[in-house]
């Protein structure tokens, strides 16, 4: 896998984000048995202001969010609950999966509210973003079930507890 990490907000520790991205993206590809290619992924570590601009520009939602993804290929399943099309290397040998942006502010806020470690939450959001690059989504109920099940399985391989279990406190 070829990973390019771009830091726009100095609060992100470049080495830590690169390590977390490497773990999350690699674990996702391995779980889906897609680790044979040199897939290319770019991760942008930014703040709420930048991700709000991106969210407004690409999704017409002018507010911050935790993570955004831009798949290089259209892989989404046509039917609710269907499997996405596997990614392919193009005729020029390009193995780009796409780009992910993650907001420091929203990530830290969500981790604190959920009483989870920031590191685990970052890895969760990067797994989530990578699944979006691979055609998975959570808009339709059947698709959401598949995506959440994959997230829980991948995070389990990373030693991270199920993020969808609600806990009362620390």
Curated annotation (Swiss-Prot):
UniProt xrefs under HAMAP family: Endoribonucl_YbeY
Residues that bind Zn(2+): 128, 132, 138
Entry protein name: Endoribonuclease YbeY
Upper taxonomic lineage: Bacteria, Pseudomonadati, Pseudomonadota, Alphaproteobacteria, Rhodobacterales
Source domain of life: Bacteria
EC number: 3.1.-.-
Keywords: Cytoplasm, Endonuclease, Hydrolase, Metal-binding, Nuclease, Ribosome biogenesis, rRNA processing, Zinc
InterPro entries in the cross-refs: MetalPrtase_cat_dom_sf_prd, YbeY, YbeY_CS
Function: Single strand-specific metallo-endoribonuclease involved in late-stage 70S ribosome quality control and in maturation of the 3' terminus of the 16S rRNA.
One of the GO BP terms on file: rRNA processing
GO cellular component, as recorded: cytoplasm
Main location: cytoplasm
């Amino acid at each position: 896998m070829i990973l390019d990490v771009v830091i726009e907000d100095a609060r992100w520790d470049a080495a830590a984000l690169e390590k977390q991205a490497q773990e999350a993206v690699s674990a996702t590809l391995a779980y889906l048995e897609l680790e044979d290619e040199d897939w290319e992924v770019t991760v942008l570590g930014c703040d709420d202001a930048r991700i709000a601009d991106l969210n407004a520009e690409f999704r017409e939602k002018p507010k911050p969010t935790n993570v955004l993804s831009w798949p290089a290929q259209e892989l989404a399943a046509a039917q609710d609950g269907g499997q996405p099309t596997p990614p392919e290397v193009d005729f020029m040998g390009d193995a780009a999966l796409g780009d992910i942006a993650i907001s420091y502010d929203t990530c830290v806020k969500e981790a604190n509210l959920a009483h989870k470690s920031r590191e685990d939450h970052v890895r969760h959001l990067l797994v989530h973003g990578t699944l979006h690059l691979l055609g998975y989504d959570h808009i339709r109920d059947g698709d959401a079930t598949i995506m959440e099940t994959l997230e829980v399985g991948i995070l389990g391989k990373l030693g991270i507890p199920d993020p969808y279990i609600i806990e009362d406190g620390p």
